[in-house]
Every structure is written in structure tokens, then in C-alpha cells.
Amino acid sequence: MQSWHSTVLARLARAYHASTNGFERFTGMASTRWRLLFLVHSKGVCTQKDLTLQIGVDAGSITRQIKVLDHEGLVARNPHPEDNRLTEVRLTESGLEAVRRVQEQRAVFLQEMMKGCSAKEIDTFLVVLDRIAGNLNQPDFLQILDN
């Protein structure tokens, strides 16, 4: 086995945690909160079910987080006009201001985080990440555990 095999997951995890922690410290906003606000912003209006599917966490977790955002005045929740089982979520003016503020800070953060990396290196990194994600999403990927 090649030497990088023993460190690739640990290095990837450390880089992810460092970037998430750095983002949260720099912007003052938790990354999960940012993901929710940004998704609602990008969709305009969406259901909590849509958010659950997009983010990939359980519905209860999304509901709790959306309730907090609603209580803080960042989002508004309303029953879906055609299906009362669903709840629509949209940004309030305060939520839109928060998204705009964090988008500006995020751009600065990403610029600093990627400092010293060429455009070619970043493109290669993104290709590798996409390939890893594609491999992990293959239906037969977990068959390696059966061997």
C-alpha cells in the first residue's frame, strides 16, 4: 500500500474541520446555519423537506434549526399553499442582510484560505474532490466491506 493511503482521510478531515472552524470564527456564523440560510436564499422559497433532502440530515434536525432561525427573525415559515403537511421557508429582510454580509466575508475568507494556490491547482483539487465524491456515491462502493 502506498504511504499516502494511511494519511489521506486524516488530512482531508483535518482540512475540512480547519476550514469550517475558520469560516465560523471569521464570519461569526455556524456553518450549518450558513448552509440553511444560503439554500433558502438561493431557492427563494423552499420547503423544510427540500432543505432536509439538500443537506442530508434528519428532518427533526432541520426543523429545530429552522425554528431557531424563525425565532431570531432570519426566516419566516408558512404552511405550503397546496399541501398543509409541508412548511415553506423564506428569508426575511434580516435574513437577507445576514446572507449578504456573510457572502462578502466568505469571499475574503476563501481568498485567504486559497492564498498561494494557483488557479490550475484549485481546478485539479476540485476535479479530485468530484472524483472522490463520485466514487463514494457508486452503488457498489460499500461492497469492498464484504471482501
Pin down the residues of each PLM region.
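C-terminal regulatory/oligomerization modules of transcriptional regulators
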Residues: M1, K120-N147
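N-terminal leader segment of winged-helix/HTH proteins
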Residues: M1-T27
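Short alpha-helical elements of helix-turn-helix
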Residues: S6-L9, M29-F38, K49
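Short, locally clustered residues in the helix-turn-helix/winged-helix DNA-binding domain
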Residues: A13, F38-S42, Q103, D130
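Pre-recognition alpha-helix immediately N-terminal to the DNA-recognition helix
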Residues: A18, R35-F38, E97
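Short capping segments at the starts of secondary-structure elements
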Residues: K43-T47
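Residues within helix-turn-helix
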Residues: Q48-K49, G60, K67, T87
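Charged, amphipathic alpha-helical coiled-coil/dimerization segments
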Residues: K67-V127, G134
